[in-house]
Amino acid sequence: VNTDGEVNGSSDTYVAWNWLGANGTASNSNGSITATVSANTTSGCSIVKWSGSGSNATIGHGLGVAPSVVITKSIGGSSAWGVYHISLGNTKILFLNETGAVGTNVAYWNNTSPTSSVFTVGSDAAVNHSGNDMIAYCFTEITNYSKFGFYVGDALNKGGPFVYTGFRPAWIMIKRTDGADTWTMYDNKRIGYNVDNNPLFANATTTESTDDDLDILSNGFKIKRNSGRINTDGANMVYMAFAENPFVTSTDNGSIPATAR
């Protein structure tokens, strides 16, 4: 990093969350637009670059399994970060840099779910900006490493939702879908113990909050706070959760336990 205050300001404390792609890139012509792809099938993530067309198109992702989450951004444009999430389906989108509720439009994903080889984009600039290079970060579930889903908030009326992931999460992001609220992120490094897991917000530049929202457990996470952004009564909350490392292979059948805490 250089000396810029966004990444290395004097006396400031920073956090970085990193996902490993492949050691290099490869051309991928599985879709209607040829893309440049760095794919790591072990961890279930790929980075995809293509030239936006502004019209319906398919893009190869290199994972060999349909991604559960696709995050898109126009590199040269000011359009929003588009988020496809499997729990929302192929007609809806969220925007990572905004607080708004889920949006519905055929122009986002052309009402088409990702396949084992491609994801589909429509004409909206957030997903396929005409004349601009686009980037996408694709994630598929890996047993005992990553989980993408939703839960329903209870405002602590039932003690707070427990979300089973099958592993101890190292990083969690949550977004309410039916109303305006923040993208809330937690990790096991900044504080690193329950009940003091402080949130940061993907859509904001503010410092971390001191709210104690959840406990990170050996097999998932437990919501501990009556907060609109993560526990509105009756509201759907989508989440992404990752463990420290993808320890299992497809033949392990989930047999390796997470470390208890």
Short names for language-model regions:
Residues 1-261:
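Surface-exposed molecular-recognition determinants
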